């Protein structure tokens, strides 16, 4: 089952409160209090619902309500509490005596929220209180540097480096062009000829080395053959002498 309406729909007045209605509500609450908001309009003689009477009393008719604009300190407190509590307007109102949750919600959506959004869009971590931009830095010793000047400085450095690189390329090309003349090509030809001569010398040395190896091999072979020859000669003479000593018969 749904909740029963707080009052009968027929005959209930809506819209802004008149001063006479406000005075009737104030007098009744001063005399009897507000223990039961549902029954209060009927006992007070008001053609209003209980919810309307409660909101009218809490947000406008209470004697301890502060009147007038919010001070910069109150606005700063609302901003800080909203960062931690969010849209819990009743909890925020409990930290600000004399201010209602409805009033705090209205001032947040009409002034503070738009002001913070504008400051964030400008790119700064600033909090605008009473029309004054207060820049908050986590590091008190940090130095604020103009980003535009830094960008201009970096662009100038880049341009200088590029121009220097191009200048070096141009100078090197001119130097090479100045060096490439007839003497350069004659030097290249002489170097080429010298390389060919060196290659011929290397081939000649390799041929001599191979021939020397062959000669040494042939000489060693001839030497061995001579030794065998003379060995055979000596052994044959010795055999002849032995046979000559045998007596004749």
Swiss-Prot record:
MF terms (GO), sorted A to Z: DNA-binding transcription factor activity; transcription cis-regulatory region binding
Location relative to the cell: Nucleus
Any one GO cellular component localisation term in the record: nucleus
Upregulation: Induced by salicylic acid (SA), jasmonic acid (JA), salt (NaCl), ethylene and auxin (IAA). Down-regulated by cold treatment.
UniProt keyword list: Activator, DNA-binding, Nucleus, Repeat, Transcription, Transcription regulation
Domain HTH myb-type: 9-61, 62-116
Motif (Nuclear localization signal): 198-205
Disruption phenotype: Increased tolerance to freezing stress and higher accumulation of CBF genes and downstream genes under cold treatment.
Any single Pfam family the record assigns to this protein: Myb_DNA-binding
InterPro entries listed in its UniProt record: Homeodomain-like_sf (IPR009057), Myb_dom (IPR017930), Myb_TF_plants (IPR015495), SANT/Myb (IPR001005)
Keyword Transcription regulation: yes
Gene Ontology annotations of biological process type: positive regulation of DNA-templated transcription; response to cold; response to freezing
Expressed in which tissues: Expressed in imbibed seeds, hypocotyls, cotyledons, roots, seedlings, siliques and flowers.
DNA-binding region (UniProt annotation): 37-61, 89-112
Job description of the protein: Transcription activator that regulates freezing tolerance by affecting expression of CBF genes.
Protein name: Transcription factor MYB14
